[in-house]
Amino acid sequence: MGSLLRVGMVCPYSLSVPGGVQAQVMGLSRELRAMGIEVRVLAPCDGPPPATFVTPLGKSLPTSANGSIAPLAPDPSCQLRTIRALTEEEFDVVHLHEPFTPGPTQTAILMHTAPIIATFHSAGDSAAYRYLRRPVLAASNRLAHRVAVSKDAKELVHRYIGGEYEILYNGVELPAYRSSPALPSPTPDTPTIFFCGRHEERKGLDVLLAAMGLLPDEVQLWVASNGPDTARLRAQYGADERIHWLGRLTDTDKIARLQGATVFCAPSLHGESFGVVLIEAMAAGTAIVASSLDGYRNVATDDVDAVLVEPGDVDQLATALKRLLYDDVMRDRLTTAGQQRAEHFSMRSLAEIYAAHYRRLTADRAERLLRHERASDERALMRPRSSRMLDRAFRRPPR
């Protein structure tokens, strides 16, 4: 083992598709590399890898999961690439995100080439846990350390396989949200709402679009990303010129839109284990209206650093948006508190905690190997002298 700690970060989701887990994998990897840890990300990619430290494992297949469509790669070719990468790289530690999701993370557990740290992100329920409980439970014994990103995520995995879990909330690369130039509203005084999330039922975009009908005519809405409901929603609301359909944004453009918006809205209905999008808005200095979900309450407190409303309530959402769009004093109070709250979710702080776990697991493994070598030497010395002489007699001569 060299002096430089080598970590294999394995993600089951395609890095070519925006998503919360993918963002955490890449952000955490960047911070760890900046700290001098050699991290290589193993993940599916449906295009060029997003960074030089990414090993692409093949293309993904859209798969239904947790009320969403996940870009997974459970095919045999992806698993063969995973096996090859794990074998050739000889990582000191393997860090799996969503370890029991079909694809490379499951393969990495079966390979078990190094101590494994596992981070669980999902909340709510999981078909993988329900239908694969026995093999998942057996495989869980190979996990050296378990992390859940929220209490909800811990509750889900503990319900099926038990065990001890450390709760480490997700992180945000704070400097990026404070240094990017803001993209101005259509006109400087135009009240503007920003939505950024997959266009599917659980994200609540339907509710926000319906609420727009109750807001003043001057209010503008930026709708980023896309999804299975995009065509239907655009057909239904496309005539409203106040709604701007932006499509998928780069990280830089997303941050600029956050900083340029008056209010960020996260109207999700369910299935949110942790509110990273809220931390991003807080870090960017943008006021927030969001659904009062457990995952979002991990981050935000109503009337302290955000306004939280009942999920799916169009009237309540419209009322909260109108109030925050036009109350400058309230917005300033919430954004100031939000920026302070975001400090608790620094990606650098999260990376330092994980780095300490990597070093501990590496040291534990080295100690076990040393004890094993000593025990082997002791057993050899205790063997009869005649047996040792036979070993020497039949030992192959060196070539």
Write out the residue ranges for each language-model feature.
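Carbohydrate-associated surface elements
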Residues: 152, 171
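Short hydrophobic beta-strand element within catalytic cores of glycosyltransferases
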Residues: 287-290
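Conserved acidic donor-binding segment of nucleotide-sugar-dependent glycosyltransferases
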Residues: 302-303, 307-314, 323-329
